[in-house]
Amino acid sequence: MAVHIALHEIGVPFEAKPMSFQRKDMKSPEYLALNPEGAVPMMQIDGRPLTQVAACLFYLAKRYPEAKLLPAGDVETEAQAISWMSFIASGIHPVARLGGEHVANAWAIAERKFGDGEWALGRYSIVDIHLFRLYWRMKHRPNPASGFPRLDGLYARMMARPAVKRTIEIESKIGYELPS
């Protein structure tokens, strides 16, 4: 979902191929021939697989700088983006399956880290896209963690973005397993 949002923000054409976790599509011989990791998302760039949400988003932001999804020429902010992306991948994503207190603690850290602005880096970026994707999934699970006004604000701002609306609309039509 996050990679699709970024692609819609950038405005480049792409072909999405839905993958089902329930059918174990990522473990099929055809998919493993393209991507030995068997991971999603996966982008093919010049015939080579690029996996992991953070890597795909970083690639898109650097490949299409005109979209301004990563501050150009600002090493400190770029390092903050990498810090955020690492935290999301290692501090939030793995605990999503654990539920309960683990999830609440991870989101409490994200809430404090977010600060008082509208966007994680002070302006809209790949960090907001990545953070939103996991927060969106959490909010659509039974008994979601709550009490995160900054992240709720991010959620509302993201849901208002045309790229997010378009992504949700398209992914629901192609059969992507979206939470209800």
Language model features: what each stretch is:
Residues 167-180:
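Terminal-tail/helix-coil boundary detector
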Residues 1-101, 105, 111, 120:
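GST-like domain detector, emphasizing the conserved glutathione-binding G-site
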Residues 76, 84-167:
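GST-like fold's C-terminal all-alpha helical module
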Residues 25-27, 157, 177-178:
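Short Asp/Glu-rich motifs
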Residues 20, 126, 171-172:
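Short, solvent-exposed turn/loop segments enriched in Gly/Ser/Thr/Pro and often Arg
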Residues 48, 134, 172:
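Flexible loop residues that form catalytic
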Residues 17, 53, 148, 168-169:
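Residue-level detector of family-conserved "landmark" positions at structurally sensitive sites
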